[in-house]
Amino acid sequence: MGSDLNITKRLQDYILKHGLKLHPVQKEIINYNLKLGDIKRMQISISQCQFLHLIIKVSKIKKVLEIGTFTGLSTLSMALALPDNGEIIALDKNKETNKIAVNFFKKAEQNHKIKTIITVSYTHLRAHET
């Protein structure tokens, strides 16, 4: 998703005012990512967090495959919307950011819903084709 989605300032303000409130660990991830410099561009926006949460919740989704986890903001946003028996399989090739993400998942007590796999996503998916 990234920051390519064009959301007007007016829409962004509305979403922030009336949308879901962020979990404390989501806020912590955002603050952590602010310190990362340019690489933080891989973080999704707050409105995208809320949108993912809403889609998962309204659609009653129970299983999610995420490709690219970074420090876990989008993953955590979806996990918070999943039922307690829901599951996210999160593929990412970066061991360092994955370790950071897993720590955030534990802190938010959502790690039981999230299985992270360190892999090149394309290769992993090709190997598991049916």
Predicted region positions:
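Class I SAM-dependent methyltransferase Rossmann-like catalytic core
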Residues: L36-I44
